[in-house]
Amino acid sequence: MLSHDVNIYKNTVEAKKLNDKKFVVLLDPDKCNNQKLNQVIKLSNDAHVDYFYIGGSLLLHSDLDNFLIRIKEQSNIPTILFPGTTHQISQEADAILYLSMISGRNPDLLIGKHVESAAHIKASGIEVISTGYMLIDGGRPTSVNYISNTLPIPHDKNSIAVSTAIAGELLGLKLIYLEAGSGADVPVSPSMINAVSTHIDIPLIVGGGIRTPEIAKLSAEAGADIIVIGNALEKDPELIIDMSAAIHSVNVKSTSDA
């Protein structure tokens, strides 16, 4: 396990300054048995994946602590909680994305659930990274839409996304996360990614509907600092190798252009 002296957010900010794109594999413990987890960890180690995000909309049956311990036994890749509920917390993680759903108007997901979990999270000692979570229409209803009871930002309304992201930054949030949803028909568009990244100074995460290395690369080139892929890798874990190469190739291109 990483030392808690390692500051994941500080490293993320430094990477943004260097245009060093990061690739995240999203793991849902409810969908990942031991055999598949071992396969994903090995592929992730070989492909130099930057982070694991751990979470899901429900996490009904999983022992989160043991899931994280199994990862730590096989990998030095940092583990970051991506919680769907306030119960998805573990001291075995290296950090947690403290999500505020700023795209919607559900008060529980803006601040209400945070009040319930704040004392426990602070006492856990893990690094907390406040994150402005923005749902973007991915062409079909997703689990996040249903669970959050919120409407996504329309796919083609860049101006709304930009204004929302700026508001999140001005409120002091440390990251902005554009999310099309697990299994989305269409990912967040490169034009929206570019518009948002141009207008904020904090790191930008993009996920949902990224099924191919080509889409992943386009998202990174458009301005995403961190690319999150989950559903596509659940179906074909071997994609990790090509996804990583595509995302990290943007780093090489940026360095050579400089």
PLM regions with names:
Residues 1-27, 117-130, 137:
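N-terminal amphipathic alpha-helix/helix-capping segment at the start of soluble metabolic enzymes
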Residues 21-37, 83-85, 135-161, 206, ...:
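Active-site mouth loops of central-metabolism enzymes
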Residues 23-27, 52-54, 79-81, 96-98, ...:
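Hydrophobic faces of well-ordered beta-strands that scaffold small-molecule active sites
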Residues 52, 168, 196, 219, ...:
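Conserved, mostly hydrophobic/aromatic
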Residues 53-59, 95, 99-110, 180-183, ...:
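Glycine-rich phosphate-binding active-site loops on the catalytic face of alpha/beta enzymes
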Residues 64-87, 91, 117-129, 186-212, ...:
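Alpha-helix-loop-beta-strand connector modules within alpha/beta enzyme cores
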Residues 88-169:
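Conserved anion-binding
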Residues 147-193, 234-235, 239:
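Glycine/Thr-rich beta-alpha phosphate-binding loop at enzyme active sites
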